[in-house]
Design a protein with these regions (language model features):
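A residue-level marker of the well-folded mature domains of exported/periplasmic proteins
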Residues: 2-6, 26-316
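Bacterial N-terminal signal peptides
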Residues: 11-21
């Protein structure tokens, strides 16, 4: 099933539709909602964009979607946010690379009565009316449980995270580490490193960790780029380790199907994009939003990746 069909079926399954849109209202003025993402290079963000674009069509809203070339480019993202706000949008969606850096600009949005909807990564502020996101603490905790099961409850493991500034980076790291500490005293985390979500940089980091830890039994990659880096490093060094990733994408799907990766946590990126735009429309209509819109997660592996509820949220 292609991404568009997956997204449409998911939207139907969630009960989403055009009923809350602006079509047929008295105002002819176009509603404009830009989304500023954490990146554009991973298939995850392309899937989020697909959901947002579909919501724009369904709800009669002009949606734009952009993000920096690298998830290390906090300053570039702030510039994009500033430029988007200068266009005086009706509302704005924002996935923060740094949970604090954008707050001054978000205060300006609030002062201008521009509703802010956070997605994927929230900010350390109550300015966003809601955050559409995965419960990353719980999701990474599930990854820790699966890792423990697969390595037999003992041994050395490592963690490779995309950053230590975004809410997702912090929560996925802490969710995994806290679960290991709380439940698995015989598992030792020997390395926690950060690769900026870049698969090339992550590969080099993972190779160094594998070289320094010949007895490593497991490796958790906390986003798509991190997981691909771990996978590439293990293949280059011909090391057999249990690899658990995050998200999906063509390379991770192939690796899980072949057994090179044990499995991964999948989010619902299409639903995340859709619900971000939907929340913006609701905010503009004066509706009260929950502080968190949980878009859900699953653990997937070669045994369940073709189940309809799993395959619907996996992307290429």
């Amino acid at each position: 099933m292609n991404l568009k069909k997956k997204m449409l079926s998911l939207a139907i399954g969630l009960g989403l539709g055009a009923s809350i849109g602006f079509a047929g209202t008295a105002s002819a003025e176009e509603v404009f909602v830009p989304l500023i993402s954490k990146g554009f290079q991973h298939q995850f963000w392309q899937a989020v964009k697909s959901g947002a674009d579909q919501a724009g069509k369904d709800l009669n809203v002009k949606v734009t979607f952009e993000g920096p070339e690298s998830e290390a480019m906090v300053d570039k993202q702030i510039d994009m946010l500033s430029a988007a706000l200068a266009k005086k949008p009706n509302a704005i969606g924002f996935a923060a690379l740094d949970s604090k850096a954008a707050i001054p600009l978000l205060k300006k949005a609030q002062a201008s009565k521009i509703p802010v909807i956070a997605f994927d990564s929230g900010v350390d502020s109550d300015i966003p009316l809601t955050t559409t996101t995965t419960d990353n603490l719980a999701a990474a905790g599930l990854a820790a449980d699966k890792m423990a099961e697969l390595i037999g409850g003992s041994g050395d493991v490592a963690v490779l995270v995309h950053d230590q500034t975004s809410r997702t980076g912090i929560d996925r790291r802490d969710g995994f580490l806290n679960q290991i500490k709380a439940k698995y005293p015989n598992i030792k985390v020997v390395s926690v490193q950060y690769g900026a979500g870049d698969h090339l940089k992550s590969t080099e980091i993972a190779k160094a960790v594998l070289q320094a830890n010949p007895n490593l039994k497991g490796y958790f990659g906390a986003n798509e780029g991190s997981a691909i880096g771990v996978l590439n490093a293990a293949k280059e060094m011909k090391r057999k380790v249990v690899i658990i990733g995050y998200d999906s994408g063509k390379q991770q799907k192939a690796a899980v199907a072949s057994g090179e990766m044990a499995g991964a946590i999948t989010q619902n990126p299409v639903g995340m994009g859709y619900k971000t735009v939907e929340a913006a429309v609701k905010a503009l209509k004066g509706e009260t939003l929950p502080k968190i819109i949980d878009t859900g997660f699953y653990y997937w592996d070669k045994n369940n990746m073709n189940d309809p509820k799993i395959s619907a949220v996996l992307y290429d």
